[in-house]
Amino acid sequence: MTDAFSQVVGQSAAVSMLRNAVVNPAHAYLLNGPDGSGLRNLAVSFAAELLAHERENPEDHRRLALAEAHPDLLIVEREGLEYRAEEAESLRDAGYRSPFDGDRQIILIEDIHLANAVFVGMTLKVLEEPPPSTYFVLTANEITPALATIASRCTPVDLAAVDTEDLVEHLQTLGVDEDRSRAIANIADASIDRAVLLASDSAALERWEMWSQLRTDLDGTGAAVTLAVDRLLQLVDESAEPLRKRQEQELEALDELAERYGERGLGRSKLEIRHKRELRRLRTDELLMGMTAVGNAISEGITNGSIDASSGSRSLVSLNTAANDLRR
């Protein structure tokens, strides 16, 4: 690869800014953008280029960093819904250590907008007193009032929602035909990871159609509701299979790197934790996709007159409320 940024989808302005920053980087960067915009991928790509800069074997450092297995790349991520005291302590300890190999250490803090007061305080402390060899890359979906001071210590990098055409183009580079790429991009909720996962799932469009037809499948009887719910929940459960296959491939690739560089268990525990979180998130994403499909069908019904505008509007409000509750 020419550089790690070549794998980033869209975000040309952010990529250009970070690529220019590799030679003489600022002390800390805060990447802010919507969920699905590729925040983690861009942050890891930037870290990979920082660690590969002016090294004798840059491709090895780049490859290790992109696999999130470089000894001088610490990724701080939560295991649960928010950061715990133990994670704040690991950040404190890492903030003052020296690089293992080379003259740069990168600390990547993911989803800083989900940090509690203890973690925010620890982050501020390490940001204000870092050794010159340590660089910070933070990601957030929003800059909350609690993050105002942290944001003031960082160079801001804003990401936009991924354009549908960028998603279509990316899926085509992965070997997906244009018609399927466009159909998947339209139901992926502007999420790169979601689009790639759905593209590998042969039943994805079938699930979308079943959700879209849910309103017409219900005839007012409890039996119809039970049948529809059972079938849709079965499809949601089956949707995890493509993700599990991808996760197996990621573990195999990491093990190959570990064998190549003589590091047993290289980053494996962290990857397994992330995999568990991805599986939990998948169910939420599937239900949100279903709500979107149902909402689109209701909107079409209001437009063509098959659904009363007043009752249809109430249904849409209820769907939006449920979706917002699910996202929390």
What are these model-derived regions, one by one?
Residues 101-106, 131-137:
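Loop/turn-to-beta-strand initiation segments
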Residues 1-49, 53-66, 96, 132-133, ...:
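Charged, glycine-rich active-site and insertion segments that engage polyanionic ligands
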Residues 16-21, 85-106, 114, 121-125:
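Conserved alpha-helical scaffold flanking the Walker A/P-loop in AAA+ ATPase domains
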Residues 59-84, 146:
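AAA+/P-loop NTPase substrate/partner-engagement loops
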Residues 79-86, 112, 156-157:
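Flexible beta-alpha connector loops of hexameric P-loop NTPases
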Residues 31, 109-110:
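Hydrophobic residues in beta-strands of the RecA-like P-loop NTPase core, especially within AAA+ ATPase
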Residues 112-131, 142:
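Conserved Walker B catalytic segment
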